[in-house]
Amino acid sequence: PAKSKNVESFFIHLLASTCLPPSLDGEANEAMRHFSSMFNGLARSFSMRRGKNSSNDDGREAAETMAKDAKKHDMILRSSGFVNVDGSNNLASVCSKRGRKGVNQDCAIVWEGFGSQADMLFCGIFDGHGPWGHFVAKKVRESMPSSLLCNWQETLAQTSLDPDLESDKKHQRFHIWKHSYLKTCAAVDHELEQYRKIDSFYSGTTALTIVRQGDIIYVANVGDSRAVLATNSDDGNLVPVQLTVDFKPNLPQESERIIQCKGRVFCMHDEPGVHRVWLPNEESPGLAMSRAFGDYCIKDYGLISVPEVTHRHITNKDQFVVLATDGVWDVVSNQEAIQIVSSTPDKAKAAKRLVEFAACAWKKKRKGIAMDDISAICLFFHSSHHEVNLVTTSK
């Protein structure tokens, strides 16, 4: 009974948090109210099912329905362009450019009003590799948001937050998101392995995602894409803060795990300095990252899809965060990236300018090497734009 009361009280608090700010109006307001109604039903579903051994199929289905409705109401961006909903502090600029290796295997997503929460946003960038890499990247992009939403709401239903302990609440919220991300990544990787329409045995994808909830961002990284925050230092200069680790095979903790699992890590003679992951007795697959979804040929030999999950409190000094694939970071420094983005007059074009700069840098710094796919999301925390916009452009 006590636990039942805690869950009930929690959901009263949770559902209250879906209230819409006055600045949201028009179509955005109508869409958010529709999502809020859906969220209430999903929350009640979890509350009624607590303690039972039933699957979370109902919750997943509801989360996927929410995603479809968000897309219908232009709250989700999946191509190059930008999204800025009236009443939101967020402005997200997205751009992706195909490299010189064939089809573009990068993809991205921005979901404003994530989980029907007016103060939440989800964004992610995915870098596929292998023969089916572009299909794997898109599959993970489609699966991860709804799976994360489902696991987050289910974890919330099983957690009691003390409203009198603000510091404890912040600590618990992080662990709720971390637990949700760990469950989600395991589920998405398992689902991908069972999905027969995509051959992911020798193909995979990285995944770098961020959830902004109020003034907190939660960052989860699988692979070698990177998130860099731009913040004002005490002396007024804009400085970069790298929020993620590039999970490359040469990192001590990564190579140790791979070697313990009988995998191998070494560089090819024609690629000095580029460490890759190899099977015990074969010169394949030669992955340049130590964590990824898919790539089941080497999952038993040290490659994992476990995310590193971190969080950060956003202050007035923090201006924006850049999420980009290694096609950017191979030729652009963290400092260069934030300078390019901050000096772009039109925030909506920031990602495009960064991607174009990286493409030029490839020609100068990597002559004779085929340019990688280049993709970036620039998420501004304190948007000065006040308009309802979701604009897409061709890649």
Set out the residue ranges of the language-model regions.
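PP2C/PPM-type serine/threonine phosphatase catalytic core
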Residues: 2-395
